[in-house]
Regions:
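Conserved active-site segments centered on acidic
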Residues: 1-82, 88-101, 182-183
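Short secondary-structure boundary segments
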Residues: 87-88, 109
Length: 185
């Protein structure tokens, strides 16, 4: 991680399925440009990533080593340059902990939809970390970009559900991460 790395925080409920998958995929895709962590609004603190999510994340080329769930705190939200929640409810909970973070808080799917829109401006800064910062600044006033009609920006919680739900949630996360990573590379 470089000195100018952007701090990204991913948030879900238990911090064992969705947010750790997003964390590890973003970390793999962004490398030293970002310090990516995750936390849960009702975390199963200390637990590893759910066993059903591990092979999906690893097959995508990201490491699951050393992961332990953490409870979301106001300090985490305040210190993050970008908060990526897995549902709109998680985003609301994070912003309630630190209202100052509202303009840098998105759902993962929302940010991918915004930056993936043809109307989103090209990012022009030099480094990947600077392009990530520029992306956050450009995305905040464009929250409805690409939202044609009713938009569901939530990734379903696969916890204690079947492998099909894990795969569906994982694919949504992976595809959104790919859009975000591609936008800054």
């Amino acid at each position: 991680m470089s000195a100018d790395s952007i701090r990204i925080l991913t948030v879900c409920t238990g911090n064992i399925c969705r947010s750790p998958a997003a964390e590890r995929l973003l970390a793999a895709g962004l490398g030293d440009a970002a310090q990516v962590t995750s936390a849960g609004t009702g975390a199963l603190s200390g637990y590893p990533m759910d066993a059903a999510m591990v092979p999906l994340v690893e097959a995508a080329g990201a490491s699951t080593d050393g992961f332990a769930a953490r409870q979301l705190t106001p300090a985490m939200v305040k210190s993050a340059d970008l908060i990526l929640a897995l549902t709109t409810a998680h985003r609301s909970q994070a912003v309630r902990l630190a209202p100052v973070a509202v303009r840098r808080s998105f759902t993962l799917l929302e940010l991918a939809r915004i930056v993936g829109s043809p109307a989103f401006p090209a990012l022009t800064t030099e480094s990947v970390s600077d392009r990530l910062r520029e992306m956050v600044q450009q995305a905040a006033p464009r929250r409805m970009l690409g939202a044609d009609g009713v938009v569901d920006d939530d990734v379903p919680d696969p916890f204690r559900r079947g492998p099909e739900v894990f795969m569906s949630s994982f694919v949504m996360i992976r595809d959104a991460v790919d859009v975000i990573v591609d936008a800054v590379h």
